[in-house]
């Protein structure tokens, strides 16, 4: 039904020039707390597999989701935990800042995507807020660190 009303064009159909992507992976080691929490996830999974817990209380989807959050930052599961110096977020901030410094004369823009977390104003931990705070503390002007979530009109989104 969707195809009846949609005009779909794929990249190969319109031959758009696309820049060559340069991928790189940054590996970070987990904190001791993360290692302990991974062991706890394994224990939870064993209980679920063994049928020892009601699926409304815990299930593999919840465990997997908690594992994804934990892999990003331990504070995603418990915002009372410390900010681990060698976390993925801190590695990301280091990289963003390095690129910002290297391209400051060109006023280049960077886009950063995070599929976990959203900006929050309720005092709880947010990956977005943490990254913004750290970039501003390093000297990037606050006006240069924006979230798509803050663009509440089509005009703002185009800017």
Where are these regions (language model features)?
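Inter-lobe coupling linker of SF2 helicases/translocases
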Residues: 1-82, 98
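Short, glycine/serine-rich, charged loops/turns that create anion-binding
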Residues: 68, 74, 116-118, 152
């Amino acid at each position: 039904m969707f195809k009846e009303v949609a005009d779909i064009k794929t990249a190969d159909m319109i031959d758009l020039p696309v820049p060559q992507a340069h991928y790189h992976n940054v590996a970070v080691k987990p904190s001791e707390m993360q290692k302990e929490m991974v062991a706890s996830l394994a224990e939870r999974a064993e209980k679920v597999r063994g049928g020892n817990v009601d699926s409304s209380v815990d299930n593999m989807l919840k465990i997997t989701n908690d594992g994804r959050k934990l892999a990003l930052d331990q504070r995603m599961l418990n915002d009372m935990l410390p900010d681990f110096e060698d976390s993925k977020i801190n590695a990301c901030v280091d990289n963003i800042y390095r690129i910002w410094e290297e391209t400051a004369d060109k006023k280049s823009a960077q886009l950063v995507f995070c599929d976990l977390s959203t900006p929050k104003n309720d005092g709880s931990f947010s990956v977005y807020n943490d990254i913004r705070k750290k970039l501003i503390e390093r000297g990037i002007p606050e006006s240069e660190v924006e979230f798509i979530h803050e663009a509440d009109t089509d005009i703002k989104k185009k800017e």
